[in-house]
Structures are given as structure tokens and as C-alpha cells.
């Protein structure tokens, strides 16, 4: 595989930069999101290659504008948050080169790798390079992140991504999207996350793929009857996620290691079933599938509603 690319421009609260808080309103966040390219949500199928080579460059000086007046400094792998979504199959080997071009120590923890952490996950200093190799032994969407202390700060500042390892019986679909949920704990304007807010576990904002409300401004587009798969991961660092599509029902659900529902049935109920939400604790993930029966605009949210209103909110435009 090619080295992991970067994509520039990936980062609402509900009611105008509330005086003294520095937190943009939902309208301000949507307006700014409309001006920049969205984080690419659609993911390509896994390649047939058995060895995947990626270089991840750690930096801690990237500025992400959230609105016309509010920005934050994010810590990134390859210049964006979340980091690139990697993909492969069971048995594939991933060869990761971590380059630390930041101003402090950084590291990598790949949940998809079943290996001793002592060397592979150690913190490296600015200017150092680390080689990290693992073979994928189990299917799923697996979190990867910086594991340098304090881990909550490194994750909250943006150093997180996903690795998709396909189940062996994964079926083709018309569209595949990856949604990585992240929390924002805003510090001083232009600065990094606020450690006290992180410890309180009460985020100011939440986002799918790094920018609140970006898929309100740039809706996903599918057609009636097309099969759609959403790969989902809650990268936290703190709060639960309950993924829901308003007006949609999931007929196939794959949750942390296996199917709980296939075409509306499972080993016990032989059809006629459905799912309304996909719940995740931090670092959990899976996928859901559905097709839309009617044209319209469907909204996907975190059904922890205060967090949907704080940015974990997007749209799907369905046409004939």
C-alpha cells in the first residue's frame, strides 16, 4: 500500500460564541465548515496486497480553524485529525514508520496489533524514528493513537485514527464510510486542549472525523436502494457514543468481533429484526449497514443528544 496520506482542513455548540467561553455556536461551526473541504468519509476497499507500508509523521503545531474567530492547535499524525484510516485483511502485515517531527515525545499504540508494547509503543523524542510492525490477526475497526503520558491529552488533541481489518465474509456494498468520533475540550483560543476540562469528562464539542458539523455542510450522497456501510469508532478519550440515523434502520450490525444482526436476523431470531443505534464506549467500534427506501435528507447523530447538539451531527442526501 502507498504511504498514508494527509488531508488538510479536517475540526459546535449550539448557541453563538457564548460570551467569555470561546466556544463557537452550531451556526458558526457550520458556516466555517462550509468554507473548507470535509474530511474524506468514504473509504476504499482493502487492496490485495499482503504487506502494507505506512509512514506516520507526528507533529504538534498544526492550527485548525473551527470558526472565523476560534481556532485550536491540534497534535496530528500526517497533519490531520483524525489520522489516516488504514485498511487490510486478516493475515496482512503492517509496517509502520513513526517519525517524530514534533516538539515533545510521541508514540503509537495500534490496537490491531497483538504484540508486546515495551518497544513498539515506546515514546520517542523529537527527531527520532520508530519502526512498528504487526500482523493483523482479528477483524474489526481498531483504534490507533499516541500513548504518551498524559494519554488523554494526546488523544484529545487529535492523535488518533482507525485501522479497518475486513472480516473474511465481508460483502460488497455500494458505499463505505468511516466515522471516527472525537471530543474537543477547547483551551485558550488557538491553543491546545484544556486538561482540566478533559479530566472533567465534559467536552465542549464532539465531531465525526475531526470537525463538528462538517457533514451538515457537506452531506454524504447516496441513492435510494443503494447498500451503505458505516464503519464506526469512538476514539474518546472519555465519552460514550450511540450512532443513529434519523429515519433509518440498520439490518446488519457487526460489533467488536462479530455480527449481531445479518439482514435482520441472527442465530436466534431468523429475520424481522432491526437496530436503531450502534453503541460504543471509547475505543470500541464496528459497522452498520442499511439501505434507504425513500429519497430525502437523513441525519446521522450521536444519540447522546447533548453531544449531537455539540457537533456529532451530519446529513445524508438520498436521491432517486
Question: What residue spans do the PLM features occupy?
Answer:
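Copper-binding active sites and cupredoxin-like electron-transfer domains
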Residues: 1-320
